[in-house]
Amino acid sequence: VELTERGAIKVDNDYRSSVPSIFAVGDVTDRIQLTPVAIREGHAFADAQFGGSPRTIDYGCIPSAVFSHPPIGAVGLTESQAKNRLGMVRTYTSDFRAMKYVLAGRNERSLYKLVVDDATDEVVGIHMIGPDAPEILQAAAIAVRARLKKADFDATVAL
């Protein structure tokens, strides 16, 4: 079985290794090493091999987090990655206070940044720092995966 320089099993898009009868998913490969990713890869492999419904995983829409204080969450492209890949981008930043902090009289704030493809208005990245950022970014990943437009965000009534 062929390995990468770091010792991971090399696989193709169907999770097949260099030996046709050996497949690999999860942390033994050189893809994103997160439990939910390994589970999704296992489902995709089983569906393709045994269920007759091949599916792919969009590795570009997997949220990531740093569980620090304050926590950080991100999904999609950074501003720099978007500029390199797409050319012109727009960014929008804002801070806000979660309702639980408003009601408690606390001044804890979060900062978020949207990265938008200038040509299509598509939100290609969302980044956040502040309380509950990782949990919030899990839901935001749906917006990036669904290729929502900045106009969709603007048209949404906030709580």
Report the location of each language-model feature:
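FAD-site-proximal beta/loop scaffold in flavoenzymes
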Residues: 1-51
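Short, flexible active-site loops
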Residues: 25-31, 59-68
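Flexible, glycine-rich terminal cap/loop adjacent to redox cofactors
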Residues: 50-53, 62, 67-159
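Glycine-rich active-site loop/strand segments that organize a redox cofactor
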Residues: 55-57
